[in-house]
Amino acid sequence: MPAVLPEYMGYDRTIAVFSPDGRLFQVEYAKEAVKKGTTSLGLTFKNGVVLATIKQSTDLAVPKSLEKLFKIDEHIASVASGLLADARVLVSQLRVKAQINRITYEEPIDVWSLARTLGDRMQVSTLYAGLRPFGVSFLIGGVDSSGPHIIESDPSGMLFEWQAYSIGRGAPVANKLFKEKYKPDMDEKTAVKFMIDVIKKSEKIKDSDSIEIAVIKDNVKILTEEELKKLM
């Protein structure tokens, strides 16, 4: 990222003012925080979605406290890269939104409606002085009546739908592999094995201890460590 020149320093200190060349520097810095986060990935296969992420592991940490894969509703989950404290706040809001939809309409929320809620919340933080952008990006994965979806939300609040995509520090390698080898008609087993292969190459890991993977079809299923070891 180019260095900020002295004449831009005033625009660098506030989120609510564009620089003369149309930039919001704090949003750009938030995106840099995402690039430094551990890798998170998602892909769609024939009947569902695979989400995966890497946990920062330390010897004495309780594994549950390091989670980056979040179940939001029975049919939707998410992975995040960047500041996990920011991610947890937003995930809590998404879970409430999903439950309100079930109570109000007696049906599960569709994936795009939930993603728009996330994008709107993140975008609001780019509008007002005294706030900062959320330093996190998400991949929202789920299956609804329109099929499987992977939707990215970045710190600006922009939403993109992908067949296969990665965020975080390993994204350049992972997205190159997706572009070269991804096939949308993969079955579940092939999709999970392909995802593990991409993770191993993008993060250069050899064991399953730091990997989290969820498979989403009718429901969210988070793979156990034993299941991951068999696939590795």
Language model features by range: what are they?
Residues 1-232:
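Long, low-complexity N-terminal extensions
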